[in-house]
């Protein structure tokens, strides 16, 4: 992906004036890009922000981002490609005074993912796992509808090595785990849920345009090295997957519907009023397949 940075001192004055006049830092989409709710970001790692006050100050974060771009800090440019893309689209002077710059890591990532289709995946509840007693949701991004097993999965989960269910439940309730996004082969998730844990899986194909899919993938790249505190009942896997969809489509309002708890099944139901679901499929677990055979 070819990105751009500014080289004009004059553009800095023009850009600052434009931002103040338009109050671009108050744009709802800017707050979505930074995962803001109730005046602060839900992302807890410092590396997600350019400004030291970025977690609580949208204006400072926007101006610091612009300053970094104008100073040619290519690590910022390549680290946050969707932010840069959106800023270019909304600040005319920034688009005018920029030159090409290539980001090898981002190019490799986009080639690997090659997303053309997005599916919400819902493995049903796993009674023996405290983390999955309500089920789980993640996204599958595919380049070909006919070969889903060689697609990639975009997942959000607590980073933990604890095997004691009580310890996991306690830490999960009080946000003592880091929740992280990850991208991994879809067949690994199928193996984990469908075969090893014997969980049935629902797949919901989402009706997203290519531009919306591109935004989702770019934002997943921006999030891959950051974390947010994981809370079992609310800011869990399903809640954080909804952030990706909100960023993908400008008019979506999803996470605000979940104030106290986020049940995975409810996070799927909330997609229906927006006509996001265009098709669904059911993938039987090996145990259910065997049971059906025995009952025939």
Model-derived segments and spans:
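Bacterial N-terminal signal peptides
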Residues: 1-7
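Active-site-adjacent bridging/hinge elements
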Residues: 109-117, 130-132, 207-220
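Secondary-structure boundary elements
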Residues: 143-148, 211, 247-253
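Well-ordered mid-protein domain cores that form the structural environment of catalytic cofactors
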Residues: 83-120, 132
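Glycine-rich catalytic cores of cysteine/serine-nucleophile enzymes that process amide/ester linkages
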Residues: 114-198
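Activation targets extended, charge/polar-rich intrinsically disordered C-terminal tails
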Residues: 9-101, 204, 221-296
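An acidic- and aromatic-residue-enriched active-site/binding cleft used to recognize and process polar
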Residues: 123-125, 143-144, 156-161, 211, ...
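N-terminal accessory/precursor segments of enzymes
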Residues: 168-238, 248
């Amino acid at each position: 992906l070819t990105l751009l940075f500014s080289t004009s001192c004059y553009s800095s004055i023009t850009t600052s004036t434009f931002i103040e006049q338009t109050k671009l830092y108050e744009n709802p989409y800017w707050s979505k890009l930074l995962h803001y709710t109730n005046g602060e970001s839900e992302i807890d790692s410092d590396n997600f922000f350019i400004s030291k006050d970025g977690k609580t100050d949208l204006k400072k974060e926007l101006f610091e981002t612009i300053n970094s771009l104008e100073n040619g800090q290519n690590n910022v440019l390549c680290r946050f490609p969707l932010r840069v893309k959106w800023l270019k689209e909304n600040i005319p002077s920034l688009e005018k005074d920029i030159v090409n710059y290539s980001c090898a890591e981002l190019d490799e990532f986009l080639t690997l993912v090659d997303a053309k289709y997005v599916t919400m995946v819902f493995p049903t509840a796993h009674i023996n796992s405290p983390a999955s007693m309500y089920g789980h949701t993640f996204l599958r991004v595919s380049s070909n509808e006919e070969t889903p097993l060689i697609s990639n999965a975009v997942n959000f989960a607590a980073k933990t090595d604890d095997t004691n269910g009580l310890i996991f439940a306690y830490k999960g309730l009080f946000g003592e785990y880091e929740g992280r996004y990850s991208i991994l082969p879809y067949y690994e998730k199928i193996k984990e849920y469908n075969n090893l844990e014997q969980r049935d899986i629902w797949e919901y194909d989402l009706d997203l345009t290519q531009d919306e899919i591109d935004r989702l993938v770019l934002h997943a790249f921006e999030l891959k090295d950051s974390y947010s505190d994981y809370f079992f009942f609310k800011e869990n896997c399903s809640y954080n997957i909804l952030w990706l969809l909100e960023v993908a489509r400008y008019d979506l309002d999803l996470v605000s519907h979940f104030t106290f708890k986020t049940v995975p099944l409810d996070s799927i139901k909330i997609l229906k009023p927006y006509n996001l679901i265009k098709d669904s499929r059911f993938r039987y677990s090996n145990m259910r397949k065997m049971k059906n055979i025995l009952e025939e």
